[in-house]
Structures are given as C-alpha cells and as structure tokens.
C-alpha cells in the first residue's frame, strides 16, 4: 500500500518525533544495505548524507575516513546526531538543512538518501528534491537511494519503482533499481496493523537505486 501525503511533513512533525522518543527509523546502527554499499566500493567522497537522522551513516563513513556532511531538516535530529557522534568518539559534521535547498559546496561525489525520498507525496515535491540534489552534486556523482517499497505491508510511506524513475528522468541516469530491505523498529503507529509487538525489529521491502547525475 502506498501512503500518499498531501504535502511534505513539517519540520515540527519531525522535530516532535525526535523529542518524544525513538522514531521507527532510528535503529541504533547504520542500515545494513548502506554498510554493504561501502564495503563493495559504492562510496567516494565528498559525501552528503541527506535526512541523516541520528547520524549513523555519517558517523560510520567519517570513521572510515570519508569526508562526510550529514544534514537533517529537524534541529533536534542534528542535536542528537552530534551527541551520538561524541558518544562514539567520532568527529562527524552535521548541519540543519532543507532537502529542497541543499548545500552546493564542495560538490558532492556521493549522496546517501536512506528513507527520505519516500516521504515526498507529490510529483512537484519529488521534482524539487531531485533538482536540489542535482545542484548539490558534481557531474557524474552518484545518488544511493533507499526507499520503502510499495510491495511492503504499510510500515511507512512507500513508493513504486515507476515513481523513482519518473522523479529522476531528467538530468540523471537510473543505473540500477534493485529490491532490498529497510530495517526499522515497530512503534505504536504500526504495531496493531502489523500484528507485532512494539520494539520488534523488522526488515521491510525496499528499493535500492543507484542514480548517476549527468
């Protein structure tokens, strides 16, 4: 089931999620898919981790020696990401930024989007986001996009393969669009519908796209 939003969730909604507890996308570790991407040579710097949340991917890649900036729309997420990095002894960088107006310097060779794209519910929002990414990346840069699939069971907002291809039709080449999994933690919003106890770790159907900037 695809969850269609009338508009992008507000900064306050995301900030409240980080203030009130642990959102379902906060799993206390990097997504296994992103870890594997790095191991197989899919990452080169400089790297932008967009919608970084508590910064697990930024912290991982920084610790491995990459030049990385993690950005999030929610100030509370960035605050908690910085604290997370300090606790792990990693000198990682984070900034508050709007995904529709991403920093364009130094011109990123790799962008990691783990579960951000799928929150945009309208074509116009997705087009604006793709344009922002295009400005932020250098020519021939690569976007790795991990999004919940419409083949899933309603764990969160989801998209189809066609939506991904349409959003990146102009100025991009979709080099790969593979089935994958996205790890999350069942919270009160989904426990009843999924028939699972809160706190259950789930690996949900997802898309992993490799998209090259022209």
Identify the role of each PLM range.
Residues 1-42:
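Conserved class I S-adenosyl-L-methionine
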Residues 109-124:
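A short SAM/SAH-binding and catalytic strip from SAM-dependent methyltransferases
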Residues 81-82:
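Conserved SAM-binding loop
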Residues 88-99:
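Conserved SAM-binding strand-loop segment of SAM-dependent methyltransferases
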Residues 74-76:
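Conserved SAM/SAH-binding beta-strand->alpha-helix loop
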Residues 100-111:
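A short acidic, Gly/Pro-enriched loop at the edge of an enzyme's catalytic core
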Residues 127-139:
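A short glycine-rich, Lys/Arg-flanked "PGG" loop and its adjoining helix->strand segment in the class I
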Residues 140-147:
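Conserved beta-strand signature within the Rossmann-like core of class I S-adenosyl-L-methionine
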């Amino acid at each position: 089931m695809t969850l269609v939003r009338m508009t992008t969730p507000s900064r306050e909604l995301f900030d409240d999620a980080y203030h009130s507890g642990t959102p379902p996308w906060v799993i206390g570790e990097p997504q296994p898919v992103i870890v594997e991407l790095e191991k197989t040579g899919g990452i080169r710097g400089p790297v932008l981790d967009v919608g970084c949340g508590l910064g697990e991917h930024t912290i991982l890649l920084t610790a491995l020696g990459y030049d990385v900036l993690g950005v999030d729309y929610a100030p509370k997420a960035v605050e908690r990401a910085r604290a997370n990095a300090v606790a792990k002894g990693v000198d990682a960088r984070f900034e508050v930024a709007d995904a529709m107006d991403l920093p364009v310097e130094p011109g990123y060779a790799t962008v990691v989007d783990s579960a951000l794209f799928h929150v945009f519910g309208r074509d116009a929002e997705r087009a604006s986001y793709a344009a922002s990414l295009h400005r932020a990346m250098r020519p021939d840069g690569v976007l790795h996009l991990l999004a919940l699939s419409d083949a899933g069971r309603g764990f969160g907002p989801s998209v189809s393969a066609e939506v991904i291809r349409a959003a990146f039709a102009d100025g991009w080449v979709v080099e790969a669009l593979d089935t994958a999994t996205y790890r999350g933690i069942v919270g009160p919003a989904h426990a009843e519908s999924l028939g699972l106890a809160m706190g259950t770790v789930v690996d949900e159907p997802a898309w992993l796209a490799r998209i090259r900037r022209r």
